[in-house]
Amino acid sequence: SEAMLYGNQVHKAAEHFIKDGTPIPKKFEYLNPIVNSLNAIEGDKHCELRFGISYDGEKHKETKFFAKDVWFRGIADLVIVDGEKAFLVDYKTGKNAKYADTAQLDLLAAATFTHFPEVNHIKSALAYVVSNEFIKKDHTRELQSSYYATFDEPLEALAAAEEHDVWNAISGPLCGW
């Protein structure tokens, strides 16, 4: 779709700016204040960082993104690691943050803690680049297991629906029921 293409172009422009200083194209120059401030943060910058996480029922471990034992896959738009602290950013190209959901940040923070064992605190944000809104959240290593559990309840409901072949409508902004 056109919106998807636009989102991909924005992500690529931000990635190339952070990675190698490629100037932001004119049509996306509204990104400059955001990417300049992110680029000024101290630390090792990782763009489009792919996480593969396995889970054996007791412990979450790092694995390859397409490994057979992968339990969770996620891609962080930008992770900046500076010793025990990190910054995690997910760019959003929607009009505004009205339907912002930070559950994605919880899972990516959990994966960041797994990938970078030295990190103990993460400041994360959904960066709505068009409206210049930031939905922020702090994460601590002590709560890592609760971040991984973010989708336990909906996944259990999905498994039950599949087992009993009962698919009840769920009210929400994207549901016409």
PLM regions with names:
Residues 9, 103-111:
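Short amphipathic alpha-helical face segments that pack within enzyme cores
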Residues 9, 13, 174-177:
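Residue-level detector of well-ordered alpha-helical segments, enriched
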Residues 11-18, 155-159:
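Regular secondary-structure segments
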Residues 13-98, 103, 115-125, 129-132:
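Catalytic cores of nuclease domains that cleave nucleic-acid phosphodiester backbones
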Residues 55-62, 68, 97-100, 110-177:
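Metal-dependent nuclease catalytic regions and adjoining charged, substrate-binding loops involved
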